[in-house]
Amino acid sequence: MGLASSNDFPDPLTLSPIRKVHIVLAGILFIFNSAFGSSLPSGAHDAIADSFHLAHDDTKLVLLNSLYLVGFAIGPLIFGPLSEHVGRRPVLIGTFSGYIIFTMACALSPNFPALLVFRLLCGLNAASPNAVLGGLYADILDNPQTRGIAMALFMVVTGFGPQLAPLVSGFVSTVSWRWTFWVGLAAAGVGYPFILFIPETYVPVLKKRHARRLAKAGKQEQNGCNTIESQGPGHRGDGILSIFMRPFVMIAKEPVLLFASLFMGFTYAMFYLYFQAYPIIFQSKTPISGKNIGLDQSLNFLADLYGLSPGVAGLAFLPISVGALVAFSLFLLYGSYHSKAVKENKAWAMLEEYRRLPLAALGAPLLPIALFWLGWSSKLSIHPVVPMMSGLFFGIGYILIFMAMINYLTDAYKQYSASAQAAASTLRSCLAVCLPLATNPMYGELGINWASSLLAFIAILLAVIPFVFIKYGQWIRSRSPFSQRVMKGELTERPAETVV
């Protein structure tokens, strides 16, 4: 690792197992709060609308989640590079503190515009773990299998948190919509002490601090001066501007990154569209049959199919959470199977594309199945549990796709993976902002059946992406500029953001 010669240099890989568990748990608690907060107002829309004198079907209510996701889109572009300059610890502590402050501000909001601003700022701070945790875990976990399990837990939590929030807010908002955010603040308070006491783990920052201590003690060695700046993603003349611009350059020049990001982006947008679609389906009282109506009538037309209360309707998200747990089990099983194949030197296991992408190929067809199931089983003559169970397939597919694609990007771009993940995170968050805004008009014009089917057809088109990558991924990467540099071993170093 090129550590300084002094024996007291803190190597994060040598931390005790208990200390590593603490760091992993701290990251999991932060990402849980980040994900939980993203959909926290979903079950409280009616109460918020009543408080601020808005119509229950006012499209502006969608902004409560969408603006949070705008913060998700912007945050990784800031906090990923920032963590490579000032370290993981100050970024995580600062952003978790910001998340807590602005969650409290949401609970105290005097009006609806103020609430929207505070939601944006919550999302901006909550985006930090999306950009930083992969690197944090890579800093301390050098065993690929252990690191893979940590990141699998990361993905399960990102799927479970948003599903739990509408259930909680649906029941709590019957007291007051403000209590929705007080509960979010309490949940953040549980995780905050864990973050406060994590150590710094980023080696280049630790080297700089250690060198400063040696200099103050009069023990600075010449080779220390020469190596302080030789580590990290930007050590060969990459300025701050270059580091911040790299995600945009990569998304334009790397087909693998672009199409993987589009696939994850649509899946992610569907995940958040469900928070708008489920209330339409499960909290209404009269069937939506797919009539074409004017915009002035469309939102009224969205009223009412099953007529469940917000709290009970929140139970519809539980099958998605169960699906996430099933996907985690499949991830572990395939990881074990692949590791065994590698030890046996099987030819297919040596190919980079087979390391994770078969999981995405398994998950991709499950999305259209879930959407067709949801769309065509949502009828008064069919018990609401039947369309709810479609979420099991969606949860499995969603998590499998994300676990596979995120790790594939890291495998493909190695030392550039931080920038690749930042680009992917920003693109998928942008899609997650835009698509849910179309939910009410789309379901109003097309009805539940055909609106869900339209999304299913798009999912079918995108489902070919992992299969194309499995067959042609290596050929595509060999002709892409950043991938070529990785394959040639340029700028090789211990990758700060490796997520295996």
List PLM regions with ranges.
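Conserved MFS/SLC helix-loop-helix module at the cytosolic interface between two early adjacent transmembrane helices
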Residues: 74-113
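C-terminal transmembrane bundle
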Residues: 35, 66-69, 104-110, 119, ...
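Helix-breaking motifs and short loop linkers at transmembrane-helix boundaries and internal kinks
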Residues: 37, 52-53, 86-87, 108-114, ...
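Short hydrophobic/alpha-helical segments at membrane-entry points of transmembrane helices
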Residues: 111-119, 131, 180-181, 260, ...
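Glycine-rich segments within core transmembrane alpha-helices of 12-TM secondary carriers
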Residues: 146-174, 182, 187-191, 323-328, ...
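Intracellular terminal tails of multi-pass secondary transporters
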Residues: 1-38, 42, 46, 178-179, ...
